[in-house]
């Protein structure tokens, strides 16, 4: 079954219930959330996440396979500042607990940045961090995200992701998030040869580890190492390639999550594109006038 959704907000008093309601308003049957603001470590206690009401709403609206995204503030690739590394490890452990409480099985993690120390040193540090953070009996997987290669990001190639996985003791607790924008920006030709890229992924990492798909177009050309998301069909990847990926038979059971930009010039009145983009990806027809329609809705 096609599980298609987007990033939604989990905030206020409604928390998980509000996230599920927002997802339902877009015609989604899955969604991704941050457990709090992605740029800080302030989090509500688990008992204030309104989980019971949220799970009831999810069940009533056929929401499943939801995904949590770890905050950007976690950088377990940092070997320069021990305090940054320790914060990352400790906060990742508490995020795993919140993810478990929410009933999610996957927590997306940007592997980390080596902050100028070189990829090998960064990867070694990430492996150490994951070995410290993972608890062998946990039922949540850390879904390492494929990165664009911006700055000193680790995880810009399938080989780097595989190197991390191979170094972790309990690597049965690791999976992968395949981000279309990041992978394109890293230099992989998902536009003309997605099957070839997926085959390469399978040989190096194993397609059975691919548990989350981030479906985003890209504002940049292939290999730009930029990581700037575009709306579906309005970037350098294009609608046809993204539609092909969303409906790929090998990835039928993988939840697909949109993280495309809100539409509009004015920050206060920007609109979420997800309802329209999800419908477009489901029915298989690209609407070149979509952005105008969203702005005028």
Swiss-Prot record:
InterPro entries cross-referenced by the UniProt entry: AP_endonuc_2, AP_endonuc_F2_Zn_BS, Xyl_isomerase-like_sf, Xyl_isomerase-like_TIM-brl
Residues bound to Zn(2+) 1: 69, 110, 145
Comment on bound cofactor: Binds 3 Zn(2+) ions.
Positions of Zn(2+) 3 binding: 182, 227, 229
Lineage of the organism: Bacteria, Bacillati, Bacillota, Bacilli, Bacillales
Known cofactor(s): Zn(2+)
Keyword Cytoplasm on entry: no
GO biological process, one term: base-excision repair
PROSITE patterns hit by this protein: AP_NUCLEASE_F2_1 (PS00729), AP_NUCLEASE_F2_2 (PS00730), AP_NUCLEASE_F2_3 (PS00731), AP_NUCLEASE_F2_4 (PS51432)
Keyword Nucleotidyltransferase applies: no
Enzyme Commission no: 3.1.21.2
Alphabetized CDD domains for the sequence: AP2Ec
SUPFAM superfamilies given in the database record: Xylose isomerase-like
Keyword vocabulary terms for this entry: DNA damage, DNA repair, Endonuclease, Hydrolase, Metal-binding, Nuclease, Zinc
Protein name (database record): Probable endonuclease 4
Pfam families in the record: AP_endonuc_2
Function: Endonuclease IV plays a role in DNA repair. It cleaves phosphodiester bonds at apurinic or apyrimidinic (AP) sites, generating a 3'-hydroxyl group and a 5'-terminal sugar phosphate.
């Amino acid at each position: 079954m096609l599980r298609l959704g987007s990033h939604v907000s989990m905030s206020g008093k409604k928390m998980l219930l509000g996230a599920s309601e927002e997802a339902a308003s877009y015609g989604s049957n899955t969604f991704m959330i941050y457990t709090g603001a992605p740029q800080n470590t302030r989090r509500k206690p688990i008992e204030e996440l309104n989980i019971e009401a949220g799970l009831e709403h999810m069940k009533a609206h056929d929401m499943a396979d939801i995904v949590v995204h770890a905050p950007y503030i976690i950088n377990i690739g940092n070997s320069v500042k021990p305090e940054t590394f320790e914060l990352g490890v400790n906060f990742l452990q508490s995020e795993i607990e919140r993810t478990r409480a929410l009933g999610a099985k996957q927590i997306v993690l940007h592997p980390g940045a080596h902050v100028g120390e070189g990829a090998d040193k960064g990867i070694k540090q990430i492996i150490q961090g994951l070995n410290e953070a993972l608890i062998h009996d946990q039922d949540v997987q850390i879904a390492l995200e494929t990165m664009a290669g911006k700055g000193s990001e680790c995880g810009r190639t399938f080989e780097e992701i595989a190197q991390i996985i191979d170094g972790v003791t309990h690597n049965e607790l690791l999976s992968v998030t395949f981000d279309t924008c990041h992978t394109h920006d890293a230099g992989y030709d998902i536009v003309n040869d997605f099957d070839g890229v997926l085959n390469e992924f399978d040989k190096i990492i194993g397609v059975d580890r691919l548990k989350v798909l981030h479906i985003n177009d890209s504002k940049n050309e292939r290999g730009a190492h930029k990581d700037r998301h575009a709306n579906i069909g309005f970037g350098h990847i294009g609608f046809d390639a993204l539609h092909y990926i969303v409906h790929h038979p090998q990835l039928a059971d993988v939840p697909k999550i949109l993280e495309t930009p809100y539409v509009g010039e004015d920050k206060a009145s920007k609109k979420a594109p997800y309802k329209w983009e999800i419908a477009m990806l489901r029915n298989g027809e690209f609407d070149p006038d979509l952005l105008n329609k969203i702005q005028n809705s």
